[in-house]
Amino acid sequence: MTDPIIIAIDGHSSCGKSTMAKDLARAIGYIYVDTGAMYRAVTLYSIRRGLWKDGVLDTETLRDEMSDVRITFRLNAETGLPETYLNGENVEQDIRSMEVSAKVSPIATLDFVREAMVREQQAMGKSKGIVMDGRDIGTTVFPEAEMKIFVTALPHVRAQRRLDELRAKGDATTTFDDVLANIEERDRIDSTRAVSPLRQAEDALVLDNSHMTIPQQKAWLLERFQEVTGS
């Protein structure tokens, strides 16, 4: 049996990183960590605490209260997938709302938020054997990761995928244009922020999944894993 490694999967929003990371982790027996869910949980906390006034975040209050934000993952026995908990409450569905999606990128630009999240993520990966997806895993969190993937897809493809997810969850009001505008704005913020901007690591393998099925993506990732580990 080969020694466990760290697998970093980075890329744009709504390009299917979480789905492929979950599938890969399950197939190879690794732990999956959804770092995007961590930032979404902080965002949900800020919304529930009323820290947004007229679209502006009270960053100083959030900074003062970051020590009160506890994010954990627990395995759902029925689905076999990890779910996100905020201060002991299952918020897996709540963090996927459009309101959270609209505010998560500004939250993720805050240095004190990213520093806190990166510390947590690095602690989770100390023993290796993990698949972690996000925006800066291969560049900031684990620059030494043995396997790095950078995922991309056409904006309109990502928007349709995200809209399909929202419809499946009962959202009948959000439009395609709403989702596309949100994705394009998140791309802009993620790529231009001062702290840990979204960028492709020099040694990352690029996966454009615009026209790939989920099984095809899984097969591609498994092949790359076998090449890296020699298994």
UniProtKB/Swiss-Prot annotation:
Annotated EC: 2.7.4.25
Domain of life: Bacteria
SUPFAM superfamilies according to UniProt: P-loop containing nucleoside triphosphate hydrolases (SSF52540)
Top-level enzyme category: transferase
One Gene Ontology cellular component annotation held by this UniProt entry: cytosol
InterPro entries in UniProt: Cytidylate_kin (IPR003136), Cytidylate_kinase_dom (IPR011994), P-loop_NTPase (IPR027417)
Reactions this protein catalyses: CMP + ATP = CDP + ADP; dCMP + ATP = dCDP + ADP
Similarity-based family: Belongs to the cytidylate kinase family. Type 1 subfamily.
Identification of the protein by name: Cytidylate kinase
